[in-house]
């Protein structure tokens, strides 16, 4: 099978036949969502011949691997992995933001670029970051919640890219993220720490959705 290569701001899926998480499942990481931080000098590397998926979270990597093994393209795998990342590390890779894609088609040897950077809303004004008394909000309060998010462009970009480079049904690429969110997962340390610094989020309607 000739896999295409995709390089995305949130995910890299390479053409390899061996994967670090070859026999593991998403459920295996319910109690260990984050890998240990170690000296980069001790980092290991792998060489693959058929496909390889690399993400910031093992559950997203496993999801990408599953899609590739089911006959999906690298774009399909990237989308499925992104939905997992949106769930387990929304502070770093949420669908409420934007991204860029560089996609290499091994058959045509063409490189495709997709721009999904978010933009400010048309009616945006600096007053959004001011309190009712006219003074500016603190940093954490200002950047937390829906008002600090630009017009999301990530999902529309993925949908358009999928129309060109994907072959699995669009809705099936959300299955792993839906399953993980429905069954529950342990929140990683970084997300827990950042959430604790923004207790006002529980009172924001936009943050609760």
Language-model features, listed with the residues they occupy:
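N-terminal signal peptide c-region/cleavage motif recognized by signal peptidases
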Residues: 15-17
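N-terminal secretory signal peptides that target proteins for export/translocation
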Residues: 1-2
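Cleavable N-terminal signal peptides
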Residues: 9, 19-20
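Sec-dependent N-terminal signal peptides
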Residues: 5-13
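Noncatalytic scaffold domains of N-terminal-nucleophile
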Residues: 23-62, 66, 74-75, 79-209
């Amino acid at each position: 099978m000739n896999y295409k290569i995709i390089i995305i701001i949130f995910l890299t899926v390479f053409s390899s036949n061996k994967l670090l998480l070859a026999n593991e499942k998403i459920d295996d990481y319910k109690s260990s969502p984050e890998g240990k931080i170690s000296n980069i000098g001790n980092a290991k590397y792998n060489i693959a011949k058929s496909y390889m998926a690399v993400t910031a979270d093992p559950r997203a990597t496993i999801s990408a691997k599953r899609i590739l093994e089911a006959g999906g393209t690298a774009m399909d795998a990237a989308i499925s992995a992104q939905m997992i990342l949106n769930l387990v590390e929304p502070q770093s890779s949420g669908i409420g933001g934007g991204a860029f894609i560089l996609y290499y088609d091994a058959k045509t040897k063409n490189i495709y670029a997709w721009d999904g950077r978010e933009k400010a809303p048309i009616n945006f004004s600096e007053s959004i970051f001011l309190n009712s008394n006219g003074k500016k909000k603190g940093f954490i309060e200002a950047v937390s919640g829906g008002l600090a998010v630009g017009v999301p462009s990530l999902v529309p970009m993925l949908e358009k890219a999928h129309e060109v480079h994907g072959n699995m049904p669009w809705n099936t690429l959300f299955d792993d993220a839906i399953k993980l969110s429905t069954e529950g997962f342990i929140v990683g340390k970084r997300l827990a720490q950042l959430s604790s610094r923004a207790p006002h989020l529980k009172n924001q309607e936009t943050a609760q959705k």
